[in-house]
Amino acid sequence: MESFAYILILAFSIGTLFFAIALRDPPKIGK
């Protein structure tokens, strides 16, 4: 079960990093 927790934390960190980048640099796809 430790692997599941590790994957969950890894996915959360990646999601947070992606969210921070999205906030810092607004997506230009809609324009």
From Swiss-Prot:
Membrane-spanning intervals of the chain: 3-23
BP GO terms, sorted: photosynthesis
Membrane topology (UniProt): Single-pass membrane protein
GO CC, any one term: photosystem II reaction center
Subcellular location: Cellular thylakoid membrane
Family assignment from sequence similarity: Belongs to the PsbT family.
Subunit organization: PSII is composed of 1 copy each of membrane proteins PsbA, PsbB, PsbC, PsbD, PsbE, PsbF, PsbH, PsbI, PsbJ, PsbK, PsbL, PsbM, PsbT, PsbX, PsbY, PsbZ, Psb30/Ycf12, peripheral proteins PsbO, CyanoQ (PsbQ), PsbU, PsbV and a large number of cofactors. It forms dimeric complexes.
Protein name (database record): Photosystem II reaction center protein T
Organism for this UniProt entry: Synechococcus sp. (strain RCC307)
